[in-house]
Design a protein with these regions (language model features):
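Catalytic cores of enzyme domains
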Residues: 3-4, 33-62, 67-195
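TRNA-binding/sensing appendages of the translation machinery
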Residues: 12-38
Length: 195
């Protein structure tokens, strides 16, 4: 077995630290509010979250970004465990009031555009990445699921909830604010990646 020299280990650590700094800097560049690392070994893929998708979300079984198209929870787990790193991020939006449904929809659309920009910045510098975002995909007026392949597979971001992630618990563990206060809405996403 060949061991890395301290200089080689330091070089790899420096590269990893620099990449982490770049990922964080680009998060703020695209106007995300918060970002924090998540220990992939501690991820929990919870059945009840997937059941909530199935029973409470209009996007279930209607999009390539949502269950069942994203695979079983076991397939999602296996997909995630192929990566060495994960960052959870969010964006908090101010609303005009607690019943500002148009503000929520506009914020959701904006968040998806921000995640697209973030992916465009990071994908070229990461060896592999998987971006997860909130709710279903809205890129096309009508999704091709299940009759034909996705029209934009290179831009497809699976839903973070579709992987069975309890966002409240994940945010708390990562030190992110789940609730931004009165008259706000916060959306979450994640990037799993290898350097």
């Amino acid at each position: 077995m060949i061991k890395a020299t301290p200089a080689e280990e330091k070089g790899e650590m420096d590269r990893s630290e620099k990449m982490t700094e770049t990922i964080i800097r680009n998060a703020y560049r695209v106007t995300l509010s918060e970002i924090s690392p998540v220990d992939i070994s501690e991820l929990e893929f919870e059945d009840w979250v997937r059941d909530f998708c199935k029973n409470g979300c209009r996007s279930y079984n209607s999009s390539w970004a949502c269950p069942p198209a994203v695979g079983t929870l076991e397939e999602c787990r296996e997909r995630c465990l192929q990566y060495g790193n994960m960052m959870l991020f969010d964006k908090c939006y101010k609303l005009s009031g607690s019943f500002d449904s148009i503000g929520v929809q506009n914020a959701m659309s904006d968040f998806k555009l921000i995640v697209d920009r973030y992916a465009e910045l990071l994908s070229p510098i990461l060896s592999r990445s998987l971006f997860l975002t909130n709710e279903g995909c809205t890129r096309c007026a009508e999704c091709t699921w299940p009759d034909a392949p996705c029209r934009f597979p290179e831009k497809l971001h699976h839903t973070i909830e579709g992987y069975g992630f309890n966002i409240t618990k994940m945010a708390r563990r990562a030190g992110l604010h789940y609730n931004g206060g009165p008259n706000t809405v916060t959306f979450f996403g994640a990037v799993l990646y290898d350097i």
